[in-house]
């Protein structure tokens, strides 16, 4: 039975990537996940921490600007975060 049978392949691969970063998972499970990712043609960088970055380089500029605009209008966001969003928006224009 395939890992992808009747499942969204991106979700399956995402689960295997998460397995590699989970400290509560056995080495055997991590090896299996690494093999699945390699067989699927997914490049895995072991130096990657799995954390997201704040680099907006590959993102849709319209979506990035929209997110910053939403931050400015959200009453639950701190003044510091709003100031940061304003600076980022000014840099996009």
From Swiss-Prot:
This is Conidiation-specific protein 6. Residues 1-93 are annotated as: Disordered. Keywords: Conidiation, Differentiation, Repeat, Sporulation. Sequence repeats lie at residues 7-37, 59-89. Belongs to the UPF0654 (con-6) family. It comes from Neurospora crassa (strain ATCC 24698 / 74-OR23-1A / CBS 708.71 / DSM 1257 / FGSC 987). GO terms for biological process: conidium formation; sporulation resulting in formation of a cellular spore. One of its GO terms (cellular component) is cytoplasm. Coiled coil: none annotated. Residues 7-89 are annotated as: 2 X 30 AA approximate repeats. InterPro entries: Conidiation-specific_6, UPF0654_domain.
């Amino acid at each position: 039975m395939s890992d992808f049978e009747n499942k969204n392949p991106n979700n399956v691969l995402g689960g295997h990537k998460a397995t590699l970063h989970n400290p509560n998972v056995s080495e055997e499970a991590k090896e299996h996940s690494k093999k699945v990712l390699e067989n699927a043609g997914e490049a895995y960088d072991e130096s990657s921490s799995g954390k997201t970055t704040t680099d907006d380089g590959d993102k849709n500029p319209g979506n990035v600007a929209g997110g910053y605009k939403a931050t400015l209008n959200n009453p639950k966001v701190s003044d510091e975060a709003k100031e940061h969003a304003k600076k980022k928006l000014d840099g996009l224009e």
